[in-house]
C-alpha cells in the first residue's frame, strides 16, 4: 500500500512517526558530540525519555511481548513500517532499541558516516544475519574469509553455506598477506569476512587495505571485532562495512547474557540485493530477514548488557594491562613454547596491532595515545598435548570453560572445545594445535593469576 492510498487518519500517524524519527535523529546527533564513556553510560536515554518512563533514570525492561496500539489506524501505520514502533518483541523492543542505539554510536565513534545496529540472540546469529542476505539469488557465488576464525564461524561457512547450499568458500590462510586476499576475490565474491584479532590465535589483518580490495570487487567487508570491542578498535573507521560482536563476551563481561550484534555503515558496498539493503543494512535486516528468522534477544538480557556496557572503556584498559603483565611472564617461562599476544614485540602481527589497537580517548586521559591489546592471549605448552592438558587441569583459580571476556579469568583448550568440530583440516587452517591454551584474563590482580599459572606449570 502506498502512502497516497492511506486514509487521512493513518497518514496522521505517519506524520507523527516522521516527527519521532526527527527527534531521535536529533538525539543521536547530540550524543555523537559526547565522549566515548558518556555515550556508553547514557546512550540515547535522556531526561525526556525518563519522564516518559515514570522518571526511571535507568532504561526500563519492557518485558511485554507485544505493544498496545491507540486504534486500528495506529496499528496499520506501525505494521506497514511507516512509523517507529515495536509491535512485537520478535521484531523490535524498546529496551533492545536502547542497546542497539548505544552500540551503533560507540562503533561509530570517530566515524563520519551514519550507522545502525541490529541486536540478536547470540553472536552466531549476528554473524548469520550479517552474511546470509548477501547469498540470495542464483548463479556462481563465493565467500572470501580468513581461516583464522572462531570454530562456530568456520562451521557456519563450511557446512551450512558451503556443503549444504553449494557456496564456494575461499579460505585465506594468512590474513596478513594482502596478495592472498586479492587473488581469492573476484566478480562472484558476495562478501569478505575476517576476525580482528582472531579467536583463539589472535591473527591480525590490515582492515584498511583489505577493505579497499573488497570494495574494488563491489562487496562488503565484514569484521568480527569481538575480542577488541569498540573501546580498542572500530573497524568502520578503517573502511569495514559491517562489524559483528558476540556481546556475550567482553562487552557483557558479567556473563549474565548471551547476545550478538551487527553494526553497519549506511550506503555499504554490495553488488546484490535491493537498494534498502545497501542504504541501511541493519534496518533492512531487522525489518525483514531478522523478522522472519526470529533470533530475538530477551529484553532483560539487553538490560544486563547495557549495565555492563557503561564501564567498557575502563574495563578494557584494566584487563589489557593485566594481560600484558601475564603475557610477559609466560614468555619468560621455559615450559612455554610460544605466547600469542598482540602486545608482545615477538608476536607475528605486532606492527599491525600497534597501528590499529588504541584505547579510545586515551589521549584525553594522558595526553598521548595509548596502545591496548585486549585481554585474550594464547600459549602453547612444551611437551605436547598431554602436558598442556596437565597444566590446564592444574588450574585452581582460573576457570576451565569455553567462555571468554568474563571479569573472571577463564581458560580453554580450543582443539577440544571451540574448534573441535571442524576437524584436523580446519584446525590446521586456523593454526590451532592441541597444546594451545587460550587464556582470557579477568579483573583479578595479575599477581594472583600468575601464581595460579605458575603452580600449574610446576605441579
Q: Model segments located where?
A:
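PLP-dependent enzyme catalytic core of the Aspartate aminotransferase-like
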Residues: 2-23, 107-113, 164-170, 183, ...
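Conserved PLP-enzyme active-site core in the AAT-like
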Residues: 2-52, 106, 112-334, 339-340
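Conserved C-terminal alpha-helix-loop-beta "cap" of PLP-dependent enzymes
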Residues: 28, 42-51, 335-437, 441, ...
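A glycine-/small-polar-enriched, mobile loop at the entrance of the PLP active site in fold-type I
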Residues: 52, 58-105
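Pocket-edge structural micro-motifs
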Residues: 63-67, 90, 121, 413-415, ...
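Short, acidic Gly/Pro/Ser/Thr-rich loop/turn segments
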Residues: 68-72, 269-270, 312, 384-387, ...
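Short amphipathic alpha-helical segments
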Residues: 84, 115, 258, 300-301, ...
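Short acidic-aromatic active-site loops that bind/stabilize oxyanions
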Residues: 88-97, 116-120, 197-200, 442
Amino acid at each position: 500500500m502506498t502512502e497516497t492510498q492511506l486514509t487521512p487518519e493513518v497518514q496522521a500517524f505517519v506524520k507523527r512517526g516522521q516527527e519521532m524519527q526527527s527527534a531521535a535523529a536529533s538525539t543521536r546527533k547530540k550524543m555523537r558530540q559526547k565522549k566515548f564513556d558518556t555515550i556508553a553510560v547514557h546512550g540515547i536515554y535522556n531526561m525526556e525519555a525518563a519522564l516518559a518512563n515514570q522518571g526511571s533514570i535507568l532504561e526500563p525492561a519492557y518485558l511485554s511481548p507485544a505493544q498496545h496500539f491507540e486504534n486500528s489506524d495506529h496499528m496499520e501505520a506501525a505494521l506497514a513500517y511507516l512509523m517507529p514502533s515495536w509491535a512485537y518483541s520478535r521484531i523490535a523492543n524498546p529496551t533492545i532499541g536502547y542497546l542497539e542505539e548505544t552500540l551503533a554510536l560507540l562503533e561509530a565513534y570517530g566515524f563520519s558516516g551514519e550507522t545502525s545496529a541490529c541486536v540478536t540472540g547470540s553472536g552466531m546469529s549476528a554473524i548469520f544475519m550479517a552474511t546470509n542476505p548477501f547469498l540470495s539469488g542464483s548463479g556462481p557465488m563465493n565467500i572470501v574469509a580468513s581461516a583464522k576464525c572462531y570454530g562456530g564461524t568456520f562451521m557456519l561457512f563450511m557446512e551450512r553455506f558451503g556443503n549444504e547450499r553449494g557456496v564456494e568458500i575461499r579460505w585465506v590462510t594468512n590474513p596478513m598477506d594482502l596478495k592472498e586476499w586479492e587473488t581469492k576475490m573476484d566478480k562472484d565474491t558476495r562478501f569478505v569476512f575476517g576476525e580482528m584479532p582472531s579467536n583463539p590465535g589472535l591473527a591480525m589483518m590490515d582492515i584498511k587495505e583489505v577493505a579497499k580490495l573488497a570494495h574494488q570487487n563491489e562487496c562488503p567487508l565484514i569484521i568480527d571485532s569481538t575480542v577488541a570491542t569498540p573501546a580498542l578498535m572500530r573497524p568502520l573507521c578503517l573502511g569495514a562495512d559491517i562489524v559483528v560482536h558476540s556481546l556475550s563476551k567482553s562487552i557483557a563481561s558479567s556473563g549474565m547474557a548471551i547476545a550478538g550484534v551487527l553494526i553497519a555503515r549506511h550506503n555499504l558496498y554490495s553488488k546484490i540485493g535491493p537498494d534498502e539493503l545497501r542504504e541501511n543494512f541493519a534496518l533492512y535486516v531487522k525489518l525483514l530477514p531478522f523478522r522472519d528468522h526470529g533470533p530475538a534477544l530477551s529484553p532483560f538480557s539487553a538490560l544486563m548488557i547495557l549495565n555492563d556496557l557503561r564501564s567498557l572503556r575502563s574495563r578494557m584498559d584494566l584487563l589489557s594491562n593485566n594481560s600484558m603483565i601475564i603475557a610477559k611472564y609466560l614468555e619468560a617461562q621455559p615450559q612455554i613454547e610460544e605466547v600469542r599476544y598482540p602486545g608482545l614485540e615477538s608476536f607475528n602481527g605486532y606492527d599491525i596491532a600497534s597501528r590499529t589497537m588504541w584505547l579510545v580517548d586515551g589521549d584525553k586521559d594522558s595526553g598521548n595515545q595509548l596502545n591496548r591489546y585486549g585481554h585474550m592471549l594464547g600459549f602453547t605448552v612444551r611437551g605436547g598435548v598431554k602436558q598442556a592438558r596437565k597444566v590446564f587441569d592444574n588450574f585452581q583459580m582460573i576457570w576451565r570453560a569455553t567462555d571468554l571476556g568474563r571479569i573472571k579469568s577463564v581458560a580453554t583448550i580450543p582443539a577440544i572445545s571451540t574448534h573441535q568440530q571442524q576437524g584436523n583440516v580446519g584446525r590446521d587452517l586456523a593454526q590451532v594445535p592441541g597444546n594451545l591454551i587460550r587464556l582470557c584474563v579477568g579483573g583479578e590482580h595479575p599477581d594472583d593469576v600468575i601464581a595460579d599459572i605458575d603452580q600449574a606449570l610446576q605441579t
